Amino acid sequence: NLNEKQLFLFKKTSELCKKVGLNSTEIALYESDEINAFATGPSKSKSLIAFSTGLLEYMNEDEIEGVIAHEIGHIVSGDMMTMTLLQGLMNTFVMFAARALATVIDNYLDDEDSGFGGLSIWGYWILVWVLEVVFMIFAYMLISWFSRKREYAADIYSSGLVGKDKMISSLESLKKSVNQILPKENKRDSIVFSKISNSKKIYFFQTHPDLDDRINYIKNN
């Protein structure tokens, strides 16, 4: 049997989805203490929004509504498919660029006595691997930058759908949750902590902007 908050979640998600024309979006609830939600699926007509039980227990109805609208924003904008295509494109680019540059370096170092060019066959493939690692770091930075832009856009969409106050309240609640719920030793591996960490050392690899930045962005737009 569903409790009061679970009934609210399913009813409100269905209501907001229908309001924006997402009549076939599925709703799921999964067991986890973490406060988390995500949208997935290949298209608007084949999409799913999943919520953790921890989110329901920690957030009030207004905050939950802000989260629902944020995830709907990702679906309406087609972010899941866009991110999948971008990641595929970046992977292809990394493999091609690494081999192309390794070949250029190999030819540059070429000498007449070497049957493999300037590098041995093992040297060539080790160089390819090193270049792939380097290029992948930059590719992931680009993917993370794009993901952060999509998070800002989903926040604005949510603000337009249910109001700025509810979206801001959701973010403020998420911000408070880490120190209150997660023990210190679990923060490093936490999905939630990875979304809200304010560490400038890893900022360029974060898929989500800092929560303070998101809150200010909503207030100013």
Where are these regions (language model features)?
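Bateman (tandem CBS) regulatory domains
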Residues: A50-S52, F135-Y140, K201
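Basic, amphipathic juxtamembrane/active-site segments
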Residues: D79-M95
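Residue-level recognition of transmembrane alpha-helices
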Residues: T84-G88, W129, L182-N186
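Active-site-proximal gating segments in proteases and membrane effectors
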Residues: K19-K46, G115-L119, S144-W145, S158-N221
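Alpha-helical hydrophobic/aromatic positions enriched in membrane-embedded helices and signal peptides
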Residues: D62-E63, Y124, I202
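Peri-catalytic and regulatory segments of divalent metal-dependent proteins
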Residues: N1-I72, V76-M81, L182-R188
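Phosphate-/nucleic-acid-contacting segments
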Residues: A154
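Hydrophobic or amphipathic, alpha-helical segments that drive membrane association/targeting
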Residues: N1-E34, T40, T92-K149, K175-Q180
